[in-house]
Amino acid sequence: MRLTAQSQRLIVRQVPLVLACATVVAAFANAASAAGPPAAPPVSSFAPVGDLMAYVDECVATFTPVLASAEAYDRGKARLEKDADSLSAALLALHLHDQEHRLKHHAGVMFHAAQQLATAADYAAAQQAWQALQAANRGETSAVPQLDWQRAGEMGIVMKQVTLLHGKLKRGARPGSRFDGAAEENARLATVLAALAQCSQSDVPPGTNAADTIKWYDLCAEMRDLCGETSRALHARDAAATAAALARVEQNCTACHDGLRKQP
């Protein structure tokens, strides 16, 4: 097909406009990514206090035998590292929560202790972090200055923990005779996943460009909100709503893995 002279002149005039629009879009993406993650909504909108507190209690009970001796620690260290990261996310959510609770003034100290527990080089360091976490859990520490949302742990370990918790949630929340009985436990899992997603907004994968950084923020926010929706559906004992929310969580995970990063 041959273009007329008028059409050729029109195309030539439009090229600078197209390039200018592309430049504006790129500049907007760069500015938005440089500004950091968007402000988080109130924590109560995606992570109920009761779920977070119950998860803290669950982790304390689980960690106690693992940290009872050096031998037990060596056997359970790999699992402890992952669980300490999800505990960190729950504690940061409690620290920043918009509702009052027993750990409101101590969750920040516990967050730091959980982070140290996850990265402890040996049993002695793990014990020191564990003692600090327990003291704060008993209310024996002073409050730390207000923290900001930040990553829960090293990305590779956090992603493995997300995969583990997500798989457990999918299996446990299937419609059937056991749905109602396991709803509270599964709601806690969904809430912890929501907290991990919010923390992950602050940990953009290395080498991510400006446009994909914005996409990362959006995917993390969507994951947070969908897991919060899943938790609410489970608390309501609504199997259909739970299944629908989990299907969208699955789509989010696929978009994250395929579009931004590949799990090792």
Region annotations inferred by a language model:
Residues 29-35:
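Boundary at the C-terminal end of the N-terminal hydrophobic targeting segment
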Residues 8, 22-24, 33:
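Intrinsic disorder/low-complexity segments in short proteins, especially the signal peptide
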Residues 35-264:
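Mature extracytoplasmic or organellar-lumen-exposed domains after removal of signal/transit peptides
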Residues 15-27:
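Bacterial N-terminal signal peptides
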Residues 13-14, 228:
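Hydrophobic alpha-helical context, especially transmembrane and signal-peptide helices
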Residues 1-12:
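N-terminal secretory signal peptides that target proteins for export/translocation
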